[in-house]
Amino acid sequence: MQLFVRAQELHTLEVTGQETVAQIKDHVASLEGIAPEDQVVLLAGSPLEDEATLGQCGVEALTTLEVAGRMLGG
């Protein structure tokens, strides 16, 4: 299925739904140079856990995931 990932640019990925959020972060890192530990992947504004698969998160075909930078501070 196709998935859209919006980071600094919009990317289209071909996925099966079995990929983990961490794998998506690795892919974004290779495309945009943002370290995975500095990324937060959001679905409808809610952050997704690295260990969860896309299917477990409810990601369907043609879904757009947002990638935000992790905020520093406390």
Curated annotation (Swiss-Prot):
Please name every pair of cysteines joined by a disulfide bond in this record.
none
Q: Which Pfam families match?
A: ubiquitin
Name the InterPro entries on file.
FUBI, Ubiquitin-like_dom, Ubiquitin-like_domsf, Ubiquitin_CS, Ubiquitin_dom
Misc remark: This protein is synthesized with ribosomal S30 as its C-terminal extension.
| Record family assignment | Belongs to the ubiquitin family.
Entry protein name: Ubiquitin-like protein FUBI
